[in-house]
């Protein structure tokens, strides 16, 4: 999954790294335990990896192999893959990146994949064979299906302990709650998924993500009651009604096409992070944003041009889009991190709260900076293209300050 909502992470000082860590948690990044790419990275980081590129079923796989790449298009015999393999990937990987071998496209029978396998990747482009009941072992926690895969799931097809399921771009089948394992926590849908948003029966799901560029235009019918993380389709542009969003939702990301007014009571009190897509341009009326909201971000190329007001005091992180240039007269009292737009050029005297620790001002900002304008606890200050001399004492003593940083290293986000 990729998104223009992702912030940039370029600075390397200790405070900046800590900021990036917090910002990723607040803004867009999928929570670590819901991320489809974090489990295997941890596996590689925390254990000794022995990779093997299996180029023919007649070749013997080393018994020490724990990461196996299937690089052929022939049936896989039963009981051949050793019971030490943890990561099974139907794609050939070399040290310089991924290179495709022959696309595997054969049925997988029970007993083919050993009980040790936890992560299964059909990254090859053509795989589209129906899954066979109980062929994927109960040890499997993560399943990534190829872009061509478009087979409906039947009872027993998916492992009973599956935590994360990611479908490819051509998958467009409804999800039957009776055949989806109760262990499933995270579901990632490809660009082509265009079934009704009727997921209320998937009660174990806590993370639901539509891929960037998704074509799904359908309204929400029901969402999982325990959902905490929701990223809607870029084509979604329907009103959000009261009670539509789950009561435990913490992070909500609207796609690029969403531009509906938000009414009081439509966003659940549990919401901590909200991210708006490209075309969103609606005012924030009083009491619309939940009291305990922690972060607000706008798309990099956001159209948002409304007055930035009625923001809850507990908000700690704000990121504006590239062109936002409305005067800001007040900011939340608990704010720690702010990224003004590249076009912002209004006075900030008396605007920045004492809680602020990280501040980015874009290349259009040319207002005078004087002692006392920045709070004394500021840790990171970036002025991208500031043309004027800065009087002594303006930048707090312990602040990591960069003026006119090099291209690509100018964002605190």
Curated annotation (Swiss-Prot):
UniProt repeat feature FNIP, residue ranges: 104-148, 149-192, 222-257, 258-301, 304-343, 344-386
Mind telling me which InterPro entries this protein's record contains? FNIP, LRR_dom_sf, STK_FNIP-Repeat
- Give GO MF terms, alphabetically: calmodulin binding
Listed A to Z, the keywords are: Calmodulin-binding, Repeat
* Domain of life of the native organism: Eukaryota
Q: How does it assemble?
A: Interacts with calmodulin in the presence of Ca(2+).
Per its record, how is this protein called by name?
A: Calmodulin-binding protein CmbB
Q: Which organism is it from?
A: Dictyostelium discoideum (Social amoeba)
